[in-house]
């Protein structure tokens, strides 16, 4: 199996293709990307027959920015007979996956696929039973075994394959299902909530998103991101010349500072989180974020980089490389991750966590 399907936001297929070609090439897994505009997915076809499996095992999924999900697949199954779609699919998967832990019957995230998605949900139940009978799936769901993927690109037309549960997205179609909280002041709140789900393991939330932490929200108005911090019982400095939602001010947890987010300098030394969703050139935002991290003004940050119209992968890569270079120059170890989230539009969301200082005598445990 030499093909890898990568699901992405429709309209960002070229960026997804450029990224997987670049990062696979760095690992000497060579191939080419098949791209169809606004399809919501890319197929990376490796030149060597087993390199699809090698790619999804060895390249960390968390290092990808534009892919929501990925899985290795075989040849396209076409013209599935309406009276029996199951038998050909089971036949394709036998000998490829044994005792898989979960089945996901998916489509690309496009308007055209909405009707097909309804079919996929109905089709999952009988297909799961048949795959269990054939030994392709285990008799119970388990996160310790590979995920079996059946990816429909049209009625009667699908790819079959698998991903590794320790190196994929845990979400169906790579999309966390989040509900907009009615009391939140703007829909942007879902970006930060999704970022927490994507970047922070669930078993670390109590420690890293803890009650009583101090946080800063740069460019906070009207308070969509501040809302997520307040919901987790943090104390928040919300920095913006624009007004904050009164409902947030009434909590008593928010201090509104009428300042420019680029000029604000914190006075506290125990700020755990800084978040930022400002509409500004990505290079300017990256420089500000690097300044906060280098100076130790926060332990972790989540921020958005707005994307230009062209060369979007190159621009994001350049901005992330700049932040990494600044951290390296000042002897700071950090984890950097970036992802175009489901709730992002022409932007990507970045998470940086300071780990420890590489220089003796420096402490990050403020």
From Swiss-Prot:
List of residues binding S-adenosyl-L-methionine: 188, 221-224, 240, 260, 277
Protein's UniProt keywords contain S-adenosyl-L-methionine: yes
Subcellular location: Cytoplasm
Name of this protein: Ribosomal RNA large subunit methyltransferase M
Entry's Gene Ontology BP terms: methylation; rRNA processing
Enzyme Commission (EC) number: 2.1.1.186
Subunit record text: Monomer.
Any one GO MF annotation of this record: S-adenosylmethionine-dependent methyltransferase activity
InterPro entries linked: RlmM_FDX, RlmM_THUMP-like, RNA_MeTrfase_FtsJ_dom, rRNA_MeTrfase_M, SAM-dependent_MTases_sf
The family this protein is said to belong to: Belongs to the class I-like SAM-binding methyltransferase superfamily. RNA methyltransferase RlmE family. RlmM subfamily.
Record-annotated active site: 306
GO cellular component: cytoplasm
Predominant place of localization: cytoplasm
Function: Catalyzes the 2'-O-methylation at nucleotide C2498 in 23S rRNA.
Organism: Shigella boydii serotype 18 (strain CDC 3083-94 / BS512)
